[in-house]
Structures are given as C-alpha cells and as structure tokens.
Amino acid sequence: MKVFVDTNVVMEMLDSRNEADLIGSIFDWLDNHEIKTYLSVGSFYTITYLSERLLHKQGLTRPQLTGKLRELLIGIIDEFQISSIGSKELLKGVSDEQFTDLEDSYQLQSASYADCDILITINTKDFKDCTDSQIKIYSPRLFFKEFIEE
C-alpha cells in the first residue's frame, strides 16, 4: 500500500485542529507498518508558507522562527516521500474537467504519479467526481475506521 496525504491533513495536525489526534494516530500507524507515505512538492511549499505564518502567530520572530521552521520541515521530509510532477501531469490536471478546484486535481495527479493506492484528504467532497482514478479517496476518519480500528 502507498498512501498520499493531502495538504489539509498535514495542516490539520500542525495547527492542532479538530482531527489532529486522529491524524497523529494515522501517521503513527503508517510509520509503524512501514507504509510509504507521500506528499506533493506543491503541498510542501504550502506547508512551508502556512507553518511560517503559524509560528509567527505563536510569537516567534527571526532567526528563531526560521530555525523552528527548518526543524519542522526536516521532520516532514524524513517522514514523507515527495512526489514531484512535471508539465505532462500538470497539463492533465489543468484539463481534468471533473475538478472545479484545480489544486485537488494536481494532488490526484501527484498521487497517481507516485503510484499511490490511497489519497487521504479532509475534503473528500472535492474528489467525489473523480471516477477515472484507481486511487481510493479516504477521509482521515474513514481511513482510521477501515485500516486501524479493531
């Protein structure tokens, strides 16, 4: 099994939102079972930007902010494989009329490029019309229920 994680799932955990504990349990399970887990390079850029804003809101300033951000991002790089797509996949994503949110289309293309079986996202409704894909779409709660919960 190969699992692709949408940006919103990582940010849910980093920002300690509603499903942070559940997502932490999923990440622990994936790690303990040595399941390859992927992020898109676009997600990494977005996580960098949003994490910097979060750290700033917590009162950190440079250079401490930059040091903490680097530490966080190195941890993410250690835990995830990074899927980077090229112009062919981007064009396919831009052209996919099943999506009204093109960023989600790029995420699906990144997951497909990495040969992932599963995509975990908080916004499953954004993927409801992607019938051409072999990738199964799960919310964190559904993934936990189907794979982890006894």
What role is predicted for each listed range?
Residues 8-9, 42, 125, 142:
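Alpha-helix/helix-capping structural signal
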Residues 2, 109-150:
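Acidic, PIN/NYN-like endoribonuclease modules and their adjacent C-terminal/linker elements
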Residues 23-28, 70-73, 107-108:
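Short amphipathic alpha-helical segments and helix-helix/interface helices
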Residues 14-15, 51, 131:
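Short, flexible helix/strand-to-coil boundary loops that buttress conserved ligand/catalytic motifs
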Residues 53-85:
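Helix-adjacent hinge/juxtasegments
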Residues 78-124:
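Active-site neighborhoods of divalent-metal-dependent phosphate/nucleic-acid chemistry enzymes
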Residues 1-39, 57-64, 148-150:
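Short, well-structured N-terminal submotif of metal-dependent ribonuclease cores
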